């Protein structure tokens, strides 16, 4: 054996060892060997692959394989991909040991005759076969002959028996071959493809019979909501007052407009300044329409780039939206209260943008947080304030 061939075999063995990692031999399910031109199976490669007793998917592409005499015997294989090699029809007999194959990819090889396919034996579980770019596809009545040769065959060269493209279905079949314990080694190995076919048949049968029950793969537990006692009306009113008080206090801490009194706008118990302090509250604060953003607004004022471009970007965007909503609702609430209305309508929102200098600047494209800016084409129209 030449030195170059010895190097290639070593590369193949190293590739297999790298894919195995720390897994045991019976925990290896997928092996891929790509573009390593080892031409035929050396005894070391054969013995290494045969140690994987749970191997289900074997891919050997573009390796110039022309001799399958020493092909590894792995009965657990359900998908074999030998695309872009130099395999001839007389070599197919050495694949007989893989009798549980369900997907066989032999595209871009040198298979010439339909008779050569008979060398594969009776693969009764074969669902998908790919022979594209082989001379055999030019045979008269090629598709019918191949479908008759393999009774269980569903997809030939990505087409079904009716010539309808089933490429997506072929991909789904390939994906279903991945064992369910590939990442959780504590689960037992199951034949995923058989379970998929079983579930599909059950669903198909139930389309015509309303009395049958479709087998459920997973039963979702019913969530029973916990019983919550209904609070009294007095406690609800007290909680509401506490929430309003907390909001007003937070507004003072983040620099929003708030009453001048030290107790956050709550009327003082001192008789002399009671009405004076209460009258200094804005109409929105009196009605509970104050929405301080707390931490989110501080994010905006800090102008830190990491909040805008890193993993906290979603928090930053939520802060922008919540901040805008708070500003608009507060200003629109003031306008509604001034007009002696209990609800905010679109006119009040439009006036809120017109009368609030900060919102007006934002809508006009004011730069915020070192680079974030808004489009001037905002949903709400901007009306210039008329001079009196």
UniProtKB/Swiss-Prot annotation:
GO cellular component: nucleosome; nucleus
Subunit structure: The nucleosome is a histone octamer containing two molecules each of H2A, H2B, H3 and H4 assembled in one H3-H4 heterotetramer and two H2A-H2B heterodimers. The octamer wraps approximately 147 bp of DNA.
Organism of provenance: Tetrahymena thermophila (strain SB210)
Xref: InterPro entries: Histone-fold, Histone_H2A, Histone_H2A/H2B/H3, Leu-rich_rpt, LRR_dom_sf
Protein family according to the UniProt entry: Belongs to the histone H2A family.
Tagged with keyword Nucleus: yes
UniProt region (Disordered), positions on chain: 256-279
Domain of life (superkingdom): Eukaryota
Protein's recorded name: Histone H2A.Y
Single GO molecular function: structural constituent of chromatin
Main location: nucleus
Function: Variant histone H2A which replaces conventional H2A in a subset of nucleosomes. Nucleosomes wrap and compact DNA into chromatin, limiting DNA accessibility to the cellular machineries which require DNA as a template. Histones thereby play a central role in transcription regulation, DNA repair, DNA replication and chromosomal stability. DNA accessibility is regulated via a complex set of post-translational modifications of histones, also called histone code, and nucleosome remodeling.
Compartment(s) where it occurs, according to its Swiss-Prot or TrEMBL record: Nucleus; Chromosome
Protein keywords: Chromosome, DNA-binding, Leucine-rich repeat, Nucleosome core, Nucleus, Repeat
Residues of the signal peptide: none
LRRCT domain mapped to chain residues: 134-172
A Pfam cross-reference name: LRR_9
